[in-house]
């Protein structure tokens, strides 16, 4: 980890890395997905999902601290160079898939709500070029964007939670706990895509100064993200009926239409436009992680791996044309995330700790 020292950042910045990578485009429309199983109780499911993420982050820290490096180092130490590199490559492929999903979802929102005739390829190129410029500046620049994104998130959601009181229906959420625990768990499972982003820790850990003592900032980051998701779901349920939620794809954008200020109209346009910094922050972290991972595995220069991944992302974005295809791709991403980060990583962490303690004896 000594070779990373010049690029390392302060531990508190991990809070902004986690929150900026977790709070993305999914927060604009996840309410419809989580309410399918738990109805208005789905906000409880978000809290459950957040607690599960906190546990997974704890496992990640145990793994990374024992490996004294990133996930690639952990895999190589346990499985050897060839098998370890192959397993690491699967995680890097997930990062690429996740970046494509985030990019295409945001472009779809812009096309539906703002510019219906704008081409997918044009927006893809503009956003990917911005991300390429940021990632080329190094990890500290990527973290700087994440920091700005985190500050922006706090301001944006403060405005977005300025609810029009005449539309609030408190009886919507009553009675609480009206669904079974099984329904709550199914709803929590459906929030996996929205809660994703914390897995970036597997690659950024060596770049955090005093990484072993930085866990509290990661856990607080997850807790803050969970709070934002919970408030987002809760306030959406106060304003919209279950029928409305079922048919509105992006509930928070729909609610933004109800927000009015004396000096500002069409708040949803401001919301969508401002969300670009969130998208760029997430993409920069994902592209940095995947391009650096390829550099470590194949010994290529990172600028070439970054160009390669950006081109792949651009091409796949053009292939996802319909709402069904985009939604199916997001579901596919969520499924991969479930098996890798909620199942494999905790198991691998436990086995790695056992192996480490066995060698110590």
Where are these regions (language model features)?
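Transmembrane alpha-helical segments of multi-pass small-molecule transport proteins
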Residues: 13-24, 47-61, 87-95, 114-136, ...
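Alpha-helical transmembrane segments of helical membrane proteins, especially in multi-pass transport
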Residues: 91-94, 228-240, 265-314
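Hydrophobic alpha-helical segments and their helix-loop junctions in multi-pass secondary transporters
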Residues: 96-99, 103, 135, 151-177, ...
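Helix-loop-helix connectors at the membrane interface of multi-pass transporters/channels
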Residues: 103-121, 207-228, 286-312
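Membrane-interface interhelical connector segments
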Residues: 239-268
